[in-house]
């Protein structure tokens, strides 16, 4: 394939990691080594590259001199080539085949869908354990070729590739443990189940921002499809039924779930969402990134019982009966209004008289004095106020600070306020 005008991997490498742009840092495989050498010595005598190379967004279109790549990059283990202009797998192969220690490769946002990946090219990636192909529009045929030639691949990222379906290869990949396939257009469970067939050892499946609308699979079949799945993200999926949440219990090793932003949970409060999900998933120890403690689980399960206690029997979920067996039938919690009082009826004592007065608790002591001025026939400047809590073991408390708010005294109905004159 003809290469568009651009820059080579080696050109960018030498520019970015030149002595002028990459200051010396102590430590193995770090920084730049500049020995005293005669003019015209090989380039590899001028640079000592780090083991992690980040060359994203550099306009790279081709490999460059393969001998120089081999001389520079024998020790490199991680390579980020994302957001470049690589569109020929042969050029990628020329780079990777000369980086023998490479374990992590990021090719995101390169237009590689414009060429076919041949098995001979893919073979040069054989040591890679983590491969990122986000927004590369890599076809499933390309993915299958990669899976055939990368026997040690453990993590694969296929996000933003516009997949609407999943295509299974002829041979499954037993090495893969983590698959990120977020932000695609997968909607039907018939497509998602193929991932279980392709990757039987899968530990983590990230399906966020797809539109999977239901888990249409019998429980026993789910256990066979994903026997090792420990973590699943269905963040912003299209799930609309509690039955789909219950089916997550069919994954025999599932411990971690992400379920934010699904239509099913929209009508519920934040507290209800978490408690109802925790109660339905007894084996899940982490929900939406937060650990589920034993105390939270018990609170959630008790909440679940009370939530469904008045629901018709035909609508009660099966989990309700399991929890009734565990805790027994629970009475609804008493409703307690914890909002602070806005007013109180108090007894105002003055000149051997007692009057019941309703006072606003958001006002200050100075404002209360003005309210009482007419009643007690004293100017505010001559007024002394004492608050007496009828349940407190101590005597009256002088209300001496004019700017203090009445609610800070904890005034309640039935308490007493004594008014005296300073002239007494």
From Swiss-Prot:
LRR repeat residue numbers: 73-98, 99-123, 124-147, 150-172, 173-197, 199-224, 226-250
A GO term for molecular function: alpha-tubulin binding
GO biological process: microtubule cytoskeleton organization; post-chaperonin tubulin folding pathway; tubulin complex assembly
Main location group: cytoplasm
A single cellular component GO annotation: cytoskeleton
Protein name: Tubulin-specific chaperone cofactor E-like protein
PROSITE patterns, A to Z: UBIQUITIN_2
Cited Gene3D superfamilies: Phosphatidylinositol 3-kinase Catalytic Subunit, Chain A, domain 1, Ribonuclease Inhibitor
Domain Ubiquitin-like: 334-424
Origin organism lineage: Eukaryota, Metazoa, Chordata, Craniata, Vertebrata
UniProt domain LRRCT: residue ranges: 262-303
Location relative to the cell: Cytoplasm, Cytoskeleton
Coiled-coil intervals: 350-375
CDD domains in UniProt: Ubl_TBCEL (cd17045)
Modified residue annotations for Phosphoserine: 18, 41
Function: Acts as a regulator of tubulin stability.
Organism of origin: Rattus norvegicus
